[in-house]
Structures are given as C-alpha cells and as structure tokens.
C-alpha cells in the first residue's frame, strides 16, 4: 500500500520591528497572533524578512506589522515573491501619521495584497482606492472576572509608556485639577522614554498625593491593576486600536478616553466616556462625575460599564483567531 501523503503546513513569517524587550502593543499583537496562527499554520516571528534563518526563504505568507518600520521587509518580499500573499497590519502611527506623508509607508500600502486595521474607524483613514483590500480584525485578550471594588473612593489607572503619542501631560494636568478630598486616586503605569517625562511624572506625584507614577510593570500586575481600578483613563492623541482599552473592557473596568478615531473605533460612536483630545479639564470633570455618581445605578460609571459590556464580544480571543485564520486562508486562495 502506498504511504499516506502528509500535506505540509503553510509557513508564515510574522515580521514585527518591536520585539519582546519593547513590551508594547505591537509586540503583544505579534506574540498573540503567532500563537493563534500556529494552531493551523507553521508560524515564526522575526524583526525583518529575510533574516539569517535558511527557512526564511520558504515562507508562504508574510504578515508584517507597521507600514513604515517594516517597509524594507515588505519591499523585499514583494520583489522576491510577487505572487505570494503579503498581509500588512497597520498601527496607529501608520494610519494617522505615516501614510499621510511617508513614502516608504505609502509604498508598503501599495505592495500589500491585504491590509488589516485593528478597529472599524481605521478603514476611513485609508486611501479610498485601497479600502477594498482592507479587513478589520479586533484584538483580544483573556477575559477576567470583574473585581469587587470599594465604594469609599474612585481609583483610576492609566497604562502606557510616557511618550508624546500617549499625551501623558493630559493626565498630569487632570491630576493637578483634582483636589485631594475629591476621593479620586490615579495610578500611572508606564516607562518614561526621556528624562523630561520622568521629571514631570515625579513632580506631579510630589504635588498631588492622589497621583502615583508606578513606572513600568510586568504584564500580569498591570492587568491586575486594570481589573481592580474603577476606570481606565486613555489620553492618546494617536492610536490604532489600544490593547489596554480591550483589556479593561474584558476585565469589567470602564474607560474614559480621548475622542480620537482609534478609540471611537474600539468603543463606538455613542460611547458616553469621551473627552476631547488634550482637554484635561474635561477629563477631570468626567472623573469627578464618576466619583460623585459612583453608588448610583444610573450614574456615569454605571452607564460606562454597561456600554463597555456591549462591546466585549468584539474582543474575544475566539473571534480574533477565527478572523485571523480566515484571512490567511482566503489570502492563500488563487485569485
């Protein structure tokens, strides 16, 4: 009898310029996608394509994160394998900054056979002529049960490295606008990427006893902090689809967020917890309202919690994995 033939798994090279030491959303996406894809495909992560590994040249599909930073890999793949799928995942800086003016990022958009945005508003940021090859895949995380939270005060948490795109100054200004007797405590988690940011965080902490800068924390305690907080604050001015938002939603923690495309695409156009980008006074007012109505079933905090619950289904791991594998399977089909 002839031996049964074994169809080898499709090989995927997942390129991400951000590797583990970056500890940011792009690395978390790459790591999670590699794990999800590996159930169906042979998948590995690399900072570039091609790299020094001999198996690199045999990949069937390239999945690249970041149009500008992965541009050399995108161009090399398109030149070496013009008929093979090239999936480009667009980050916030891609959508709302780089593709507007950066030639490398624009070329990556043209070379990709498939584009991925991480929330529904991302489609509108793409050139209209390219939207036909774009797909929305919401990121996911492991759901956590809501924690029992005190009613004696309101604890807010903000998570993100201290850099310009995250607008940490909005949180610092909001902390300055709050009074110590407002019953609102703020935890700020994230590494300072320059000495000026570290100094500002330390200065705010010294002036505002209700504000703490906890610096960078590992993933597990960061998620616990989100889970235990009454509300997550997200002040970014540019965002492609923030990990921390869906992690908060999946932990039973509602969100106060800047009204930018990336956040609206995650939380919905009618979400009641937005403040205008850069407006610390609005953020402080929302925090006060959350605190003042904390024990009311029809208060702002309760409304935010309900609104987040209605979005939670978008961020389930099973949905993300199914959408991702369906995209790769579709990309492999002959045109």
Question: Where are the regions a protein language model picked out?
Answer:
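A charged, aromatic-enriched C-terminal amphipathic alpha-helix characteristic of glycosyltransferases
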Residues: 25-28, 298-330
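A short, active-site helix/loop in glycosyltransferases that binds the activated sugar's phosphate group
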Residues: 110-134, 138-144
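Conserved donor-binding/catalytic core segment of Leloir-type glycosyltransferases
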Residues: 148-166, 172-176, 186-189
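Glycosyltransferase donor-sugar binding loop
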Residues: 185-199, 215
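Nucleotide-activated donor-binding/catalytic signature segment of Leloir-type glycosyltransferases, i.e.
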Residues: 199-217
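Aromatic "clamp/platform" in nucleotide-sugar-dependent glycosyltransferases that forms part
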Residues: 237
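Short hydrophobic beta-strand element within catalytic cores of glycosyltransferases
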Residues: 254-257
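Conserved acidic donor-binding segment of nucleotide-sugar-dependent glycosyltransferases
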Residues: 269-281, 289-295
